[in-house]
From Swiss-Prot:
The gene is rplW. GO terms for molecular function: rRNA binding; structural constituent of ribosome. GO terms for cellular component: ribonucleoprotein complex; ribosome. The keyword Electron transport does not apply. This is Large ribosomal subunit protein uL23. It comes from Ruegeria sp. (strain TM1040) (Silicibacter sp.). InterPro entries: Nucleotide-bd_a/b_plait_sf, Ribosomal_uL23-like, Ribosomal_uL23/eL15/eS24_sf. Transmembrane segments: none annotated. Belongs to the universal ribosomal protein uL23 family. Keywords: Ribonucleoprotein, Ribosomal protein, RNA-binding, rRNA-binding. Part of the 50S ribosomal subunit. Contacts protein L29, and trigger factor when it is bound to the ribosome. NCBIfam families: PRK05738.1-3, PRK05738.1-5, PRK05738.2-4.
Amino acid sequence: MSAKAEHYDVIRKPIITEKSTMASENGAVVFEVAIDSNKPQIKEAVEALFGVKVKAVNTTVTKGKVKRFRGQLGKRKDVKKAYVTLEEGNTIDVSTGL
């Protein structure tokens, strides 16, 4: 499957935190994805961009906090994260760029 332009719109960037590093030991990779993307789109994009087989996709939406900026109330953006579990024997090196 070849990578299409819309696959780059679905997958924004890899998330490298302590929690995602622990998840990578169990064969999972964490990505920030478009807020309107769904699990089948995320699975298709990861398989096309990285050439791996995806076992499961779990998603979370973190709501943006309300913060003050120069006395004005503002809201940070909502962030959607996808925990992508890979099939046995497949790996993704997230330190390389998309």
